[in-house]
């Protein structure tokens, strides 16, 4: 029946399943018999198929900083495109950065942060993503800008759709917060997208009789589910609890800090105290949904397939002018419909477009909220020393790739597609760089490039987008709803192409296409680079406890820890070689006996007397040297 409220059930589709489809097959991909699991090394190969240098960008401003990275708004010097550069600042987070790059390169959804490319500098990978002009959801909620209930419901629906897509791929976020939900400001309203997939993990499958090992305790404590904080078994329902905390932030416009959002001693939501923060203008189903998602029992939390349907139903039930219409009409009988006030009628009540929480200033540390009782509450996160009051971020050391994210290649296993450098990264008509010294990032040899007609980059059509096939899932059809959905972004405005020549054609009509990182990545540079006595410089991404190459090398007697490896049919990335993805019969490069001074040089080192003029950025990024 039209308008009937969809039920909220606890158990939903199994991990990796899509509604209406069965579980993944024995092969793990769910694409039918005979289709094997795609090799994970090709996922990384495609993710870094286009490399940019730090010097290719002009740093506009620093827009944020997290626990492990700094975020900059940058502009590409040649194309003028504005992007976001997420620079990793801790060596211990290198694995998570690589895991995030691999995953984001294969996610295609309007409510998932779009991956633009990779910037490499001094052996570290930094992700390039689209720029969101609205900032984070946390910043929007703490601002004095009014947000009506339809706007808040649309923001919640966008986040739920992004997570529904992510879960349909067999992956869950594990670090969903209002800081990691970004907002795009448009003429028609706001659009929310989900970002920061550094802690994403495959959805575990706990079988009866099998040994069950819990995943690591990771995430931001204020949004972490109780079962995660207790070190118990957890799955994708932990994302549902985090989504419930985000809904509480949306409804009451308060931070997730327990000093403002009341919590219980078992890390649950203090429902009676939270109700005192919510005005009577809040749609009751919206409030009940937030309480339902924060249930302490994971099995009772609804999956995102049902949460999105429920949010769409709530939007359909809202009155046309605003959810405060019934209350506002008792005070102002002259209010008119959305078409605008008439010259002969009184001005409509301003609360028609604003919720009750908009009528008050955002909370401040000096004025804690009044929860309507005199009970003394204790911050449960301050009772555990390892959580440090909840103002930290728990990180895990990645071990394996999150997903085999690359579809099967149409080429034979002995024939790998070439890696091409986009023409926009190289000035048209200029010869290949003679200077290969650090700290400039490696540039693929010119012989690997594809000749592009014309002076500028060609337009990349929808056929260049790759379809993602992994873990028993197919492209998920988006049900029609009142929330505005952006069409899937194609790479026409991207200066960096994130697809290889083995990509499969994709049509927007077919619907949205659909970290446990290796501990070490060794990237060998092309021949001719300076930096070592035998003209073979190398970038090294060692384990978390390893130091930079600029540090003094260990004594020769120290044992060298071998790199983990997975078999692959050949060398990866052409001139680049990733140790954890390839087990080629090559000797391990010896440790440099002398300190590498290339990273400290003030000018570039050139060969054969040729000196290239370094770029002169007006505002240098951290670590960028010319």
Swiss-Prot record:
**Assembly and binders:** Interacts (via both C- and N-termini) with SPRY4 (via C-terminus); the interaction inhibits TESK1 kinase activity. Interacts with TAOK1; the interaction inhibits TAOK1 kinase activity. Interacts (via C-terminus) with SPRED1 (via C-terminus); the interaction inhibits TESK1 kinase activity. Interacts (via C-terminus) with PARVA/PARVIN (via C-terminus); the interaction inhibits TESK1 kinase activity. Interacts with YWHAB/14-3-3 beta; the interaction is dependent on the phosphorylation of TESK1 Ser-437 and inhibits TESK1 kinase activity. Interacts with SPRY1, SPRY3 and SPRED2.
The enzyme's main class, written as a single word, is transferase
Extract the ranges annotated as region (Required for interaction with PARVA): 527-624
**Signal peptide segment:** none
One of the entry's Gene Ontology molecular-function terms is: protein serine/threonine kinase inhibitor activity
Q: Where is the composition biased (Basic and acidic residues)?
A: 348-357
Give the species: Homo sapiens (Human)
Gene Ontology CC: one annotated term: cytoplasm
Instruction: Name the chain's protein.
Output: Dual specificity testis-specific protein kinase 1
Q: Which InterPro entries match?
A: Actin_reg-Ser/Thr_kinase, Kinase-like_dom_sf, Prot_kinase_dom, Protein_kinase_ATP_BS, Ser-Thr/Tyr_kinase_cat_dom, Tyr_kinase_AS
Q: Which transformation does this protein catalyse, written as a reaction?
A: L-seryl-[protein] + ATP = O-phospho-L-seryl-[protein] + ADP + H(+); L-threonyl-[protein] + ATP = O-phospho-L-threonyl-[protein] + ADP + H(+); L-tyrosyl-[protein] + ATP = O-phospho-L-tyrosyl-[protein] + ADP + H(+)
Q: Which CDD domains match?
A: PKc_TESK
Question: What is its subcellular localisation?
Answer: Cytoplasm; Cytoplasm, Perinuclear region; Cytoplasm, Cytoskeleton, Microtubule organizing center, Centrosome; Cell projection, Lamellipodium
Tell me yes or no: is DNA damage among this UniProt entry's keywords: no
